[in-house]
Amino acid sequence: MNKNIVILGTQWGDEGKGKVVDCLTKDSSYVVRYQGGHNAGHTLVVNDKKIILHLIPSGLLHKNVIGIIANGVVVSPFELIKEIKMLETHNIFVHKRLFISNSSPLILQYHIEMDIAREKKLGISALGTTGRGIGPAYEDKIARRALRIGDLKNEKTLSIRLEKIVNYYNHQLVSFYKHKPVDYKIILRDLLPTIDLIYDMIKDTTSILHTAIQSNKKIIFEGAQGSFLDIDHGTYPYVTSSNSTIGGVITGTGVGSKSLDYILGVTKAYSTRVGYGPFPTELFDDVDKHFSKKGHEFGSTTGRKRRTGWLDAVALCRSVRINSLSGLCITKLDVLDGLHEIKICTAYKNINTLEIISFPDIDEWKNIEPIYETYPGWNKKTLGIKKLIDLPYEARNYINRIEEITQIPVDIISTGPDRSDIIFVRDIFFIKK
Ligand code: IMP
């Protein structure tokens, strides 16, 4: 039996992981966020109500589940409290069942100002970040100057270190970026009242997870962003600042690879990307309009229009290998309903040399062109279908082709935004390894 399941994105984020996590956590004891911060946006529809979570693990909507924000996550205490209060308005209370690692780096105002100032200075070369301070917060961690959640427990040293860091940031913000400075006293004034609210949640989450594993509890590891936004394996520099591929689970929680039983790669039935950077299958035609409108392809964190394109199986196969995926979950299949034909990119060609490129390096991206296989679309509705057998023949064909190309099974198919719009092809908790 598979107890510990990782759910991660195989594309550029926004694959629909939140809903899948929500569905699978129903049968689990723990749900764990291991990387990223409130740059993520996980949208869930429960009883026709839309709930968007950025930082709190999506699975916490189930009342018996314990949520962990592990050490790999960068945490804004303000965002955390905002989300806790938002959940309370939906009668979801997280008291005594949400724990935050004492080692998680904090995101504070100076990170956000630095993120914004940098993007502004980069002008047309900007990365298109979410402006949430994610990059600067991870830089502080690597530079070993970060304030971490555990530091909130000692007000005196917190204020001394905060003042030093603010001086360091203000020097760059003002002298180099010609940006407004931040005020250390205001940051401290706003931060102090948050401490009481989260004090009891601060724990050694690694130990909690080790105990849970020893007690045979089921754990869902909830990824944020997608594999090609990974700082090491993504389309650098157009990436986020964390490891959104499988390695992030291990470093971001303190749980070793032997304890991970099944790795589910969540893949949208087509592709989207927010922000700038390579996107070989990008479309600018009526199909783009179809995906945007029918798929509501607007960022849940920033509201930006997502770029859209056909499914990129070259990237997907790379993702299968990077993450050692056990199986796939195809989401938003219903968005393809009504398209006359459907394409899958199965290779990249260099437009100058006409060579087939296995995976482009940084300078090669601009010279590649996707090679497509084309399949007939379907005119029937797949929205809300719950059994594989009920899908139109052409839709099953499309799924089969994805399995053939990637050489791994499609175990779950999401056919709409609601929790219940889902096909479980196999029960992944019971698949033999
Ligand atoms: P950052 O994570 O805010 O630094 O943004 C870096 C890049 O990652 C930008 O292109 C963002 O649009 C993208 N990004 C960050 N988080 C998400 C996400 O949750 N979904 C999709 N794209 C994201």
UniProtKB/Swiss-Prot annotation:
Pfam family, one: Adenylsucc_synt
EC number annotated for this UniProt entry: 6.3.4.4
Cofactor: Mg(2+)
Record has Cytoplasm as a keyword: yes
Keywords attached to this entry: Cytoplasm, GTP-binding, Ligase, Magnesium, Metal-binding, Nucleotide-binding, Purine biosynthesis
Active site: 14 (proton acceptor), 42 (proton donor)
GO biological process per UniProt: 'de novo' AMP biosynthetic process; IMP metabolic process
GO molecular function, one term: adenylosuccinate synthase activity
Pathway assignment: Purine metabolism; AMP biosynthesis via de novo pathway; AMP from IMP: step 1/2
Catalytic activity: IMP + L-aspartate + GTP = N(6)-(1,2-dicarboxyethyl)-AMP + GDP + phosphate + 2 H(+)
Enzymatic class: ligase
GO cellular component, one term: cytoplasm
Binding residues annotated for substrate, in chain numbering: 300-306
Amino acids binding GTP: 13-19, 41-43, 306, 332-334, 414-416
Gene3D superfamilies per record: Adenylosuccinate Synthetase, subunit A, domain 1 (3.40.440.10), Adenylosuccinate Synthetase, subunit A, domain 2 (1.10.300.10), Adenylosuccinate Synthetase, subunit A, domain 3 (3.90.170.10)
Function: Plays an important role in the de novo pathway of purine nucleotide biosynthesis. Catalyzes the first committed step in the biosynthesis of AMP from IMP.
NCBIfam families in UniProt: PRK01117.1 (NF002223), purA (TIGR00184)
Protein name: Adenylosuccinate synthetase
Organism: Buchnera aphidicola subsp. Acyrthosiphon pisum (strain APS) (Acyrthosiphon pisum symbiotic bacterium)
